[in-house]
């Protein structure tokens, strides 16, 4: 009996130990499960917190971007509303005050321009070159602040060096030829090798640009080079044709410049008094204050102005005649080109007969001056195409968030604001004149410039040949 009790007691102890072991195992398992569960929960919570943080950061970023976009839009809208014309929200007194300032400053600029034109072709050419310098300065200044922030080395130095190179290529040769007449030993070399010296300057600028490249701003530096070359092409190259027009006769400079000024004035006043009263939509999205009424009205007034102002300019030889080899401030007299002379137009007999038979109209002959009809073509270009030069400039101002390129002229802005349409107009005049008006003849000035590039021995050969030809033609010697 006692033995059975002992056996039963042992079995109970074993069962209890097994139960305790299983219980401890279950506790460990549950503990590990709890730890895994808590770890998973922690990772889930951490992931959720990271996700929430990312959402908060993204939301802040989006808010900042939205704020920046709103600010940028406000700046652009503000510059658009103020860029060219008066704000629609301005009170009448403020509008008329701005109109008065703009009118007074415009009259001053026209007066100064008239004084420059009354001097000499050379002075007018220098005036155009001075305008190029000011336009280049204003355009480069748009990106100078950004370049300064990025610490671009020699930014201004390289820009002005490329400008000097382009000036030397386009304008130095005539000056060197003139100086070679007085100091042949010094300047003859530069006349003969002008093209080589121009190329050498370009190579120097190219190498200097490569040497100034800095890691981290490569893209920006190349964009700056592109910007500079674009300015040189748009300003210096096109202005070179303006100067060529001047020496063909001041009329080819005064007339197109006056057409652009006239178109700008009448577009402003027509838009000021009639804008959006008949067509309530902007002319161009890039420049919302430009109106259809101003555009259409200015075209009509510009056509009338070009026709009659051209007739006025024909009264003066110093405006019509090309410069040639005359000295500084000398009076000009020339045999006028047929385009400046009156012609009689007679209608063909067939047209005269039809007009009288069906319309009861007698078509009589009339006199006209060809240049006045050419002036109408120039006026159409100046009214329909040249204003896009202004829209191009407006796009640049919107891109860089500025109202005007400068504030040198109150109510008008900078030099670029006043000459943005003149460059493409000057190029058009050069192409139109050489294509449809200029007669095919040998230019003595061009021959003289080439003779001055020769050495003294070569000049003596030319001299002897010319002497023999003149003596033979005049009969002073026998053949």
From Swiss-Prot:
Reaction(s) catalysed by this chain's protein: a 1,2-diacyl-sn-glycero-3-phosphate + CTP + H(+) = a CDP-1,2-diacyl-sn-glycerol + diphosphate
Coiled-coil stretches noted in the UniProt entry, renumbered to this chain: none
Region: Disordered, residue numbers: 1-71
Biological processes per GO annotation: CDP-diacylglycerol biosynthetic process
Tagged with keyword Transmembrane: yes
Biased composition annotated in UniProt, kind: Low complexity: 53-69
Bias kind Basic and acidic residues: ranges: 1-28
Regions of this protein lying in the Extracellular compartment: 130-159, 214-240, 315-375
Keywords assigned: Lipid biosynthesis, Lipid metabolism, Membrane, Nucleotidyltransferase, Phospholipid biosynthesis, Phospholipid metabolism, Transferase, Transmembrane, Transmembrane helix
Pfam families per record: CTP_transf_1 (PF01148)
Transmembrane segments: 109-129, 160-180, 193-213, 241-261, 294-314, 376-396
Superkingdom in the source lineage: Eukaryota
Keyword check for Transport: no
EC number(s) per entry: 2.7.7.41
GO molecular function annotations of the record: phosphatidate cytidylyltransferase activity
Localization, UniProt: Membrane
Predominant location category: membrane
Membrane topology designation: Multi-pass membrane protein
Gene Ontology CC: endoplasmic reticulum membrane
Cytoplasmic side: 1-108, 181-192, 262-293, 397-479
Pathway: Phospholipid metabolism; CDP-diacylglycerol biosynthesis; CDP-diacylglycerol from sn-glycerol 3-phosphate: step 3/3
Family the entry assigns: Belongs to the CDS family.
Protein name, per record: Probable phosphatidate cytidylyltransferase
Lineage, highest ranks first: Eukaryota, Amoebozoa, Evosea, Eumycetozoa, Dictyostelia
Gene name for this UniProt entry: cdsA
């Amino acid at each position: 009996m006692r033995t059975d009790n002992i056996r039963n007691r042992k079995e109970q102890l074993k069962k209890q130990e097994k139960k305790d072991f299983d219980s401890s195992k279950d506790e460990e398992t549950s503990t590990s499960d709890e730890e895994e569960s808590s770890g998973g929960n922690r990772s889930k919570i951490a992931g959720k917190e990271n996700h929430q943080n990312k959402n908060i950061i993204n939301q802040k970023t989006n808010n900042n971007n939205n704020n920046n976009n709103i600010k940028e839009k406000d700046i652009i809208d503000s510059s658009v509303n103020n860029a060219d014309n008066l704000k629609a929200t301005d009170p009448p007194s403020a509008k008329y005050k701005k109109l008065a300032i703009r009118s007074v400053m415009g009259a001053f600029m026209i007066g100064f321009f008239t004084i420059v034109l009354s001097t000499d072709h050379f002075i007018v050419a220098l005036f155009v070159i001075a305008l190029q310098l000011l336009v280049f300065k204003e355009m480069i200044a748009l990106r100078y602040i950004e370049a300064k922030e990025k610490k671009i080395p020699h930014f201004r130095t390289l820009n002005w060096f490329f400008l000097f190179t382009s000036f030397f290529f386009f304008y130095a040769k005539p000056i060197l030829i003139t100086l070679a007449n007085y100091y042949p030993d010094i300047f003859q070399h530069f006349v003969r090798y002008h093209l080589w010296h121009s190329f050498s300057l370009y190579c120097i600028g190219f190498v200097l640009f490569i040497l100034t490249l800095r890691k981290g701003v490569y893209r920006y530096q190349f964009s700056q080079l592109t910007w500079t070359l674009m300015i040189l092409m748009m300003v210096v190259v096109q202005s070179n044709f303006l100067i060529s027009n001047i020496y063909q006769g001041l009329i080819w400079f005064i007339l197109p410049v006056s057409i652009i000024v006239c178109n700008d004035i009448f577009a402003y006043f027509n838009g000021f008094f009639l804008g959006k009263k008949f067509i309530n939509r902007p002319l161009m999205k890039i420049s919302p204050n430009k109106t259809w009424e101003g555009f259409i009205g200015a075209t009509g007034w510009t056509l009338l102005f070009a026709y009659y102002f051209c007739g006025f300019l024909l009264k003066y030889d110093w405006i019509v005649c090309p410069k040639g080899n005359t000295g500084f401030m000398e009076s000009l007299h020339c045999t006028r080109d047929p385009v400046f002379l009156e012609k009689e137009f007679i209608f063909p007999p067939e047209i005269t007969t039809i007009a009288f038979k069906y319309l009861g109209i007698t078509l009589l002959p009339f006199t006209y001056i060809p240049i006045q009809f050419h002036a109408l073509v120039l006026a159409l270009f100046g009214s329909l195409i040249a204003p896009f030069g202004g829209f191009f400039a407006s796009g640049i101002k919107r891109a860089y968030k500025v109202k005007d390129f400068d504030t040198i002229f109150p109510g008008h802005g900078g030099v670029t604001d006043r000459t943005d349409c003149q460059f493409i107009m000057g190029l058009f005049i050069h192409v139109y004149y050489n294509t449809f008006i200029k007669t095919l003849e040998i230019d003595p000035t061009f021959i003289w410039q080439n003779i001055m590039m020769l050495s003294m021995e070569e000049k003596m050969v030319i001299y002897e040949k010319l002497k023999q030809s003149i003596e033979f033609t005049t009969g002073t010697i026998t053949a």
